[in-house]
Amino acid sequence: YNFLRRHEKMDKFVLNLIHRPEMVPEYSATVTGQGKEEDIGDKALLTESLDIFKTQQRLAHENGLKVTIQMTYASLFNDEAVEIAKHDHEVYGDEIALSLLGLPCEEFREKYKTKDFCIWMFSMEDKKAIVNDVFEKFHDKFGFYPESTGSYYMDADLTNYTKEKYPPVKCAVAT
């Protein structure tokens, strides 16, 4: 039986290709550490980040692949990133998801009065407020709640809260 199962043809291969429009990439913090002044609103950085996202999307679609677009908090404030996601959702059937990464943007810093940006570093009370803020901003932009979300790390309390508060979420990706 095992021999037969190992040699059967696989009918379906599932690939979940995830792109995040990173308006303020976390790697940009390393540039600051090399003596450059921090500017999370740097237009050149925003343009470069958006160009990378557009290229990823174009290449995926040219090769017939659908994509899960994980919108970051920062990208929800970028009209072009939102329009690309809406377009690719309608035209190619890409999923529009929500990442709890990409928090370090001017809007986040002003609202939460911190430069911290890792969701797992906040108190549970603050995590809930951030999740509510991010999910409601997503809903305002797209008219629905995402079916998937993710972060580098999501503890059980945060995962359970997200699922309870936002039942459309069926998947959480934590790397």
Predicted regions and their residues:
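Catalytic alpha-helical scaffold of carbohydrate-active enzymes acting on polysaccharides/glycoconjugates
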Residues: 1-148, 153-175
